[in-house]
Amino acid sequence: MSEITYFFEAIQRLKLIFSRSYKLARLGVEGDAHCGKTVQHRSRVAKDPTQPNLRQIHLIHAELHEELNNAGFNVSPGQMGENITTKGIDLLKLPTDTRLHIKEATIQITGLRNPCAQLDNFQSGLMAAVLDKDKNGRLIRKAGIMGIVIAGEVVKTGDSICVELPNPPYRLLEKV
């Protein structure tokens, strides 16, 4: 079964663990620094503040934390900027526009998180650890996926996640 293992909100650009439920609003996680209809990230606002916000919510698979910890890093859920940590879903292999249903909430996947140098500010070498290359030399981004909230609901740690694939042909996730 796939489920939420941890849930976080960003307040003043910090990520905090919570032990209660949080509301997914139609613009993202209620109270989160990235919540909004248009882009919230400073670099994207500087380029064009009217761009739609395709990064309302960030999900990482718990299996990545395990991989990083086995490689010598000390990473806990929420420390890499994610709002939701999942277990049992291969997030990186989901196609664009996949919908994740958590109770009545619906998240539509928009693309891959493009990791940035802030990861190295947290732990040296972490950015390189979440990047890889496939057998053809193409870059693999392992730092999770981004999405938008289609339908809001209060969600909490332990809630089940149902995956709804879009109609084929499927589009591979690209960085957003």
Where on the chain are the PLM-derived regions?
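Electropositive, beta-rich accessory/interaction domains or terminal extensions
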Residues: 1-97, 101-102, 111, 168-176
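Glycine-rich active-site loops that engage anionic ligands at enzyme catalytic sites
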Residues: 86, 93-149
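Structural motif
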Residues: 98, 153, 159-160
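Short, charged, solvent-exposed linker or helix-capping segments at domain edges/interfaces
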Residues: 120-121, 159, 173-175
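Residue-level signal for alpha-helical context at structural boundaries
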Residues: 137, 164, 175-176
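Protruding loop/beta-arch "assembly-hinge" segments enriched in small, turn-prone residues
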Residues: 157-161, 168-170
